[in-house]
Amino acid sequence: MKKIICTLCLVMSVLCVMAQDSKVVNLQLETRMDYQREYLDGEAVKANSGFKGKYLNVILNGTINEHWSYSYRQRLNKAHADQSFFDATDWIHLTYRLNDNWSFNGGKQVVGIGGYEYDRAPIDLYFCSEYWNNIPCYQLGVSTTYTTNKGNDSFLAQICESPFNFQNEDLYAYNLMWYGSHGWFNSIWSVNAQEFAPGKFIYYLALGNEFRFGNAKLQLDFMNRATDDHAFFLKDCSVMGELSCMVNKKLNVFGRMSYDVNKTNSVGDMCVLPGTEITRLGAGLEYYPLPEGNRNLRFHLYACHSYGKNGNP
């Protein structure tokens, strides 16, 4: 069944920051409220139209001493099971910084998957790929990061609970990442093995690339997914891209696209299900009214058009 979705939203986001003089405690409050209209095959989707409260986050982080630091983000508008307040906790982790090269992290953290769309905070995204919409990206685990002497490259190794451990089957994910910062070119790449059933894995190759040209930048991501049951390249993959330009200190304009496809019969991909081939195209602007480049308050206006087949319920 072919589905066509058009969305037009007016978005306002407010960021309030409160911090003590000490570096030990830094407290932030984030919220985002939208007015949106969504249509499916020309008919208004009433449940997804009107005023919506999207995010209400509390962020607490700080530096304890030269070696120890912590970070915590709680999503106050996210439902959680009665027995697990962690369901609404995006992350809470402790970091030990051995020296300028090595650091170690433990707690609930972001699953180490490459790509700029995946790396950005959800509050800063307006429409996303089908993969992004369905990946449970915060899990308990441990990681270590090595940064080169010049500071241009960092390599992360992580072991954490699998994003697909829905039935508490003791499943794990193994992730390797490269963060590169080289002037006009930056990167967030990863290779991943995510256990979706006992002893069965789905493998990712995720290549996030950012190209900078003056006030403009192009973020282009490619992700390929495969299990032992289907061919490795291009049968199950996603492409995400965004071209943006800061017109001045207060106005940013952007165009964005994503393409998700799964032409396999494998049950391993739980984010982009078999039979999916969907494209999203859109554009928008961000306006920051406060002076001196202050981004604690912003307004958004954007439109998105989606078409294709979606195997996800």
Positions of the model-derived regions?
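Positively charged n-region of N-terminal signal peptides that target proteins for export
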Residues: M1-I4
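Hydrophobic h-region of N-terminal signal peptides that target proteins for export
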Residues: L10-M18
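Outer membrane beta-barrel
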Residues: D21-R37, A47-S162, D170, Y179-S181, ...
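Outer-membrane beta-barrel pore domains
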Residues: K23, E30-K46, N65, D82, ...
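Short, low-complexity, polar/charged sequence segments that are solvent-exposed and flexible
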Residues: K46-G50, I123-F127, P163-F164, N175-W178, ...
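Loop-centered beta-sheet repeat module
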Residues: F155-F201
